[in-house]
Amino acid sequence: KEEILSENENLKAQIDSLTEQNNKLIQDQTEYVRLQQMYNLDQQYTEYPKIAAEIISKDPGNWYDTFMINRGSADGIRVDNNVLADKGLVGIVTEVGTHWATVRSIIDDSSSAMTVSTQDNCVVEGDLELIDEGKLSFSQLYDQNNKVTVGERIVTSNISEKYVEGLFIGYVSEVEQNSNNLTKTGTIVTPVDFQHLKNVLVITVNKQDSVNDNAQAAQEATANEE
């Protein structure tokens, strides 16, 4: 009987050890996938300098509509820096401390961005009624030739006030004509999982930096011509 009990204890110890090893492998695999996704996202936007950050807190609720990251002014983070995760745009930095920053996501109902499809500009906004579906709303789309359809890719526009150009927001999931017969509204499915965010990439240049650089380049070109 004692021998059987001893064997059982040994088997239990082996099972516990294997379970621990298996959990470690799962964690390692999850971490590898996360790092691979971050790398792929970084490679999508090589034209912009970026820094990785970890989310350290969020507002109450299921959604990451406002959250805090572990990077701040000491890392080059500034207000209005754009933030990425998964496969697209997450939001924008609204407040910065030395070693932290607050991000307001695009699903927040106070957020809006000028965006562009392959056909025309429109305004994308957070919508509380659409959050549970992982969707955003868009409006002010002038699509006179009816070319914008479900599945259309939406990115930030060069005329957006605070978002740099070309950041992926999502795909059109619905589009309908307004009663004025001039503009259209609809919804967009975002590629970002706003319920399970953990890490983000922060673009460390602002839209205004790009505007200033373009203005300076234009001035230099004019001076050279003279």
Q: Where in the sequence are the language-model features?
A:
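A secondary-structure micro-motif
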Residues: 3, 19, 24, 34-226
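N-terminal membrane-targeting segments
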Residues: 1-6, 10-12, 17
